[in-house]
Amino acid sequence: VDEHNAVRKACGVFDVSHMGEVLVSGPEAEKFVQYIFTNDIAGAPVGKIYYGMMLHENGGTVDDLLVYKMADDKFFLVINAANIDKDYAWIEAQAKAFDVVTENQSDTYGQIALQGPESEKVMAECLGLVCEDLAFYTFKTVDTEGETLIVSRTGYTGEDGFEVYGSHAYIQGAWGKLIAHGVKPCG
């Protein structure tokens, strides 16, 4: 109940580092992602995030995922933890018909989700990440502490919230700062 109340009334933090991340790049990156993804991303602006599914040819679900458009030729896919190996193998198999490079970066990134009505304020005060410019389902990259983070206004709690992707060292440090700031750990 304490975790629920923190997210509904203030702010809670979730360690979601178990999620998988796949980078797709190359001259046919948009064409490839359009092919494997159910949502229409053709001509999408850089900085936009889409939720949808990857489907088998018979219409069965491979997995649901988030697609981040990093550049016209670069996309960041966030897949479910239990399906990382299966999903990546499927993505690689589909990619053979396209001029793209796929990279499983699941071991590279850690991720925290800061959720609740005070999450924007806490992101700025505690982590120095100003996010008032982010609309829901958009992201930006932020250079801080010697690395580039991916910061998105996303989440599944029904409250305002943010997800931060960075090195495991950065995420561990951010977690410590948030807990020291009084943010409730959740999940």
Q: Where on the chain are the PLM-derived regions?
A:
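Basic, glycine/lysine-rich polyanion-binding surfaces/domains
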Residues: 1-187
